[in-house]
């Protein structure tokens, strides 16, 4: 079956010991007459993905240099003695490559314990052009989704399914059955959001990524009702008894979406960065706020004025507590973005922007490291 497919898909010349690149255009070729020729590259993609699922090292996919070109795929093909052995071993799983892949994916569905693992099977079946496996995995996902699910599992699953719904039309498979699952999981994520946010800072790091994945799905898919999700984000933003980094992130998302105006932001910053708020909590909230849309935050001078005023109110011990979280907040900022922050702070403090920039962009000095090592972090 492998040999006949190489001939049918015009891939015989790639059965060489030297690695050879292959670029595929999955769109229909309208310049040819036969259906087989029109979808040659799409069928090549199905075939190569099937080899990947079977663990046959004849083909390896590379990320396209055009991020938005969902129709473009880049592969590296290379024949090896190991690939020949792997093909022989795959015969035990089915008489044809398609049968063997169906067997492997069906086994993975049976062994799956998380919905994200089933979503991986759906994604692989989707890429392999196996609609019957997609349907079987969808039914299994429906059943598993009725049980207890972690937020990270929901985030991974809806992110994968959403990408298939948005960009999968190029593979000529029916994606409609996936829509109800995404709807149900996104509603469940909305219901879980506030409760999950009562967590420590270690769990908050993972939860922050999950929230951003789920929010991206809400923004990408028109069939989702985002109003309930935003209601929960507003509640999360206003609550004081939840992880402050997650509350800050919720505020940042609402700010991006135009759900918070400048006056409301200024009031929230003043509330969070005040003498009544423990230093580490205020700095952690600001770290959450800084996780999204850096340029939008940098452009708000009032935000940096509030931060400056807040730091002025801290004593030495409180400042040391807050600086740990603030340094983490700026880790994800580029040198250019830090320069722009320096200009803001220089203007507020009446200092030279370049001098401030050098301090912000500098590495931690040994004496600073010693101070941090001597500091008692036990309280938090």
Give short role names for the model-derived ranges:
Residues 1-380:
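Extended repeat-based interaction scaffolds and adjacent low-complexity, acidic/S/T/P-biased segments
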């Amino acid at each position: 079956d492998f040999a006949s497919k190489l001939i049918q898909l015009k891939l015989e010349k790639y059965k060489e010991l030297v690695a050879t690149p292959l670029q595929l255009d999955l769109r229909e070729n309208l310049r040819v007459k036969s259906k087989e020729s029109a979808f040659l590259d799409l069928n090549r993609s199905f075939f190569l993905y099937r080899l990947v699922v079977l663990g046959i090292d004849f083909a390896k996919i590379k990320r396209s240099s055009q991020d938005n070109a969902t129709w473009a795929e880049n592969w590296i093909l290379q024949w090896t003695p190991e690939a020949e052995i792997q093909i022989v071993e795959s015969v035990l799983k089915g008489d044809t490559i398609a049968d063997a892949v169906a067997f492997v994916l069906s086994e993975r569905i049976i062994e799956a314990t998380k919905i994200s693992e089933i979503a991986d099977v759906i994604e692989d079946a989707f890429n392999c052009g196996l609609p019957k496996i997609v349907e079987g995995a969808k039914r299994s996902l429906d059943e598993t989704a009725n049980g207890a699910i972690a937020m990270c599992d929901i985030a991974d699953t809806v992110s994968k399914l959403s990408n298939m719904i948005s960009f999968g039309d190029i593979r000529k498979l029916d994606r409609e059955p996936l829509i109800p699952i995404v709807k149900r999981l996104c509603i469940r994520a909305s219901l879980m959001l506030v409760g999950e946010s009562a967590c420590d800072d270690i769990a908050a790091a993972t939860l922050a990524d999950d929230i951003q994945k789920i929010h991206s799905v809400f923004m990408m898919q028109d069939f989702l009702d985002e109003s309930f999700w935003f209601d929960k984000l507003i509640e999360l933003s206003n609550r004081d008894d939840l992880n402050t980094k997650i509350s800050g992130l919720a505020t940042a998302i609402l700010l991006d979406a135009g759900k918070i105006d400048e006056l409301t932001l200024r009031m929230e910053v003043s509330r969070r960065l005040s003498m009544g708020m423990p230093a580490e909590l205020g700095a952690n909230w600001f770290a959450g706020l800084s996780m999204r849309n850096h340029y939008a935050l940098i452009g708000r001078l009032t935000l940096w004025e509030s931060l400056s005023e807040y730091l002025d109110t801290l004593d030495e011990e409180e400042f040391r507590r807050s600086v740990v979280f603030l340094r983490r907040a700026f880790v994800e900022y580029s040198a250019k973005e830090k320069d722009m922050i320096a200009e803001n702070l220089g203007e507020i403090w009446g200092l030279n922007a370049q001098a401030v920039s050098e301090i912000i962009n500098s590495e931690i000095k040994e004496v600073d490291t010693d101070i941090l090592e001597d500091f008692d972090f036990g309280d938090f």
